């Protein structure tokens, strides 16, 4: 199986600008390629894992990645289908860019990676040059046909967001001309921007050897967006989402989804994935595929040490049937792996659920209590006025809050 065929088998290729040329380039040559990450937030999410896996697979094949962090495009914002993006300040955009670059460097550790920030060149273009030299080369009708733009026409789209496509096209041209990048990689939602970049290179350089690939949008089996838990977006930054929450998310992936996730989100070889697929069909209760998926992802985005902490946390939470069975050393680890709220005073359960992010609001917290889904250790709490005090603690310090079977948090006095 060729490298291109492996990418197809892994469901990592949705669109190709020229399949014959892309296949030849990836299978028989060494190519410099780029993938962009806009710093719209302070952290990557697990939704970025599709692109990261693709980068790692390309590296393993000997191809050379250029990672573009969009310090400039992050100031503009790629058009959303539903609403106008809130503009970031220059300071926030550059801070986010630095944070995301740091995360990517940790994930792509010991790999040959070149990092660039498009603020370096896009900030140097004055408005007259932008309109005369580049705006002239973009057809409005073509831009209006792009999916995200077309979706927004009825409600309205600003010229700022409308111009995003031109800026991303300029990125591809700059990297093609100055860094010898021939291939752009992006999600399927970026396909319109990728093809616009190819067209700009053709017009400015009179060449047609630049190429583009898009990866599919990864959805859960119910059609919802991949990478969100009950609490919201799963961030790579451990201070924004605990590694244990990500561990739990992937450990509970359904049998319908797990094999596709193994293909698209890990570097596990084909034969091993096929064996895991067979085991899932014959012995689904063992959940070997889910365990392999979880272990690979936590090790990739965090570390093998953090993986062991997550495994140990799971053992502690699911092996202690009674409050008295916990040991004090268990809580030393739980403070590292669960979301914790520290307090010196009694706290209403409703407030504690919000503070520990087990509920998004007091009204939601009350609904959870009414539905009998809230426990202190393993005792169900049914009173809306219940207050957590030192009397509820273990070792005069710790209270374990549970919502349902899988969501846990810690109150520390």
Curated annotation (Swiss-Prot):
GO terms for cellular component: cytosol. Catalyzes the attachment of tyrosine to tRNA(Tyr) in a two-step reaction: tyrosine is first activated by ATP to form Tyr-AMP and then transferred to the acceptor end of tRNA(Tyr). It comes from Onion yellows phytoplasma (strain OY-M). Homodimer. One of its GO terms (molecular function) is RNA binding. Residues 347-413 form the S4 RNA-binding domain. This is Tyrosine--tRNA ligase. L-tyrosine binds at residues 34, 164, 168. ATP binds at residue 228. It is found in: Cytoplasm. It catalyses: tRNA(Tyr) + L-tyrosine + ATP = L-tyrosyl-tRNA(Tyr) + AMP + diphosphate + H(+). The keyword Protein biosynthesis applies. A motif ('HIGH' region) lies at residues 39-48.
